[in-house]
Amino acid sequence: MKKFFPSLNKYENLIFADNAGGSQVPEQVLNNLNNFLINSYSQPTGNSIISKNLTANLDNINEFVNTLYNNKYGLIIYGGSCTQLIYNLSHSMENYLKVNKGEIILPNFSHESCVSPFERIAKKNELVLHWWNLENNSENNSENNSENNSEKYKINYNTLLNLVNNNTKLVVLPHVSNILGNILDIKYLISEIKKKNSDTKVLVDGVAYMPHGLIDVTSYNVDYYVSSFYKFCGLRISTLYIKEDNMTYLENINHYFFNNSEDINKKLQLGGVNFECASSLLGLKEYLIEFARFFNYEESKNSNKEVNFDRTLVQFIYSKIFYYEKIFNNLFKNLITNNENIEVIECKDEMQKVPIYSILFKNYDVNNVNLILNELGIISNSGTFYCNRLMDYLNIKNGVLRISLMHYNSFDEVNKIIETLNYFKKYNINFQFKCDSLYKGFVTTNLKNSFYNLEVDKNYENKRTRGYSLLDIENIDDIKIIGDLQFYQSSNYNNVNGDILRNYKNIDYKILKDDCFKYFVNTFLTTINNELTKNSIIEKIKYIQVHQIRVYTDSENEVNLVPEGIHQDGYNFIAMCCATRKNISGAISHIYDESKNIVHSLQLQEGEMLVLNDNKMFHSVSPIQLS
């Protein structure tokens, strides 16, 4: 299906893997937006030909959305975002919720957009608020017990249902958590909730589900359902489904003269519809028809035959998407099974799942991994993704790396992602450190002079200049700089400049051919490979990060080289290479064991290199001063 996506074709060397943040847009959507601006850019319900075109478009759009959702007994409200639609809904429901001090149940594993509005109302009106929390059984699990680990996280339906009582006014559910990716059985949950209290209203956030699964608001018997089309090949327009029998108690939050209106659109659809984005939905309809044709939909084997956009077609489309994306899940499942250094935050029981993978690494900060993936052509993302409550609950400080896929991703792309993720491993070996002085006194003039062209490091107060690059070192005679990588360290490792993005200019590409530089790189790789081989680990290291740093002083005052003190850098192995020393004293490298007891000290001289196991050892460097 990539042929329909201009962006995918333009950036064919990139892998789009941040689709849960927003999908790419097919040409049919773009063409319909263009068509609207040329032929229908007007107000609806008028007598002009342009206005009539728009009115007809809006009727067709409503028919399309109703078919997509199987809406038979409700109304669709349009808005710019689900966040805004839910906020509006909460205000419209406020008086209904506070009658008899109604109780509200909210999940702690959903996007914040469907949580904060109702939490705010509960606090304002002193309503009882219950939290349905993800079960975290990690403390009860043994690290080496894979059977237990499969139940590390659990979405327990019984826990939710036990919270429902005769005074429960509202339950909010994510159809899919945008972190976990697991699909909740919405139909079952709504049925069970209403068995316990038929008056309880249920709001479902379908934003993360819509791109992957069939929506059926009628079958669910849901009261409210929200989704966003920009997550499913559309523009930034969102919808709120309201079941018909919920319209009587919703209050007007719009202009005062709509107070007595029976039209719920006028009460809740503030500012009307964004006609540009709404009209583009007809392009999404065209794209989905082409999708069905691609898979030989039974009514479209004759390409000249018109295809009706009906529920049968919608069911066919989503069956193909779900089956195709299930293979993505199997591929990622194999990755996790075979790599103990990676954890996917998900429920690993029998729950179905969409291709959203929130990943943690044993030895790497997710933000650093994300920056590297982006430079390698994989568009992923990292952070909390507005699931801060879940992150706090699980004590995940810096968020997760999120890989989120769509039906236009290929199996080759998924395999490439998995191959790259496997670079980020933690090596538990007994190696501590090694010093090398083979190149002592023979650093090339070219390499020495390159230090004078570095830019000032604005992140440190001392006199420091720096360059920084991600290098492809697969061929030592053809080392390449990859992209323009920003540098990031967690505050777990750097208490001075942690948790911030630092921008440095790439090192000079000319030194990549320098014999001394290549020697340093090759010696570093040889040392690591030898130590890994001793531990029966065979790995081919393809990428390294290189910092080129010059620190100088022009006074008798000491300059602190390492303001963060005794520390680790957050990698498997590091190498410190001395290019030259000139008229300074100090800069003594200290190496410490895991208890931070000093085990070795040395003053690196020109051409010397220290290789250190950063998983086991700590290090610091003493200040310098003029000699």
Go through the PLM ranges and name each one.
Residues T239-Y241, I356-S358, L470, G565, ...:
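Conserved hydrophobic/aromatic beta-strand scaffold that supports enzyme active sites
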Residues G21, S110, A208, H407, ...:
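Short, flexible loop/turn elements at secondary-structure junctions
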Residues N165-N167, K195-N197, F524-K540, T580-S585:
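Secondary-structure boundary elements
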Residues M1-E139, E147-I429:
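Pyridoxal 5′-phosphate
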Residues I429-V546, S555-E558, I598-Q603, S622-P623:
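Fe(II)/2-oxoglutarate oxygenase catalytic core
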Residues A587-S627:
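Catalytic core of Fe(II)/2-oxoglutarate
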Residues I538-K540, I544-Q603:
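Catalytic core of non-heme Fe(II) oxygenases with the double-stranded beta-helix
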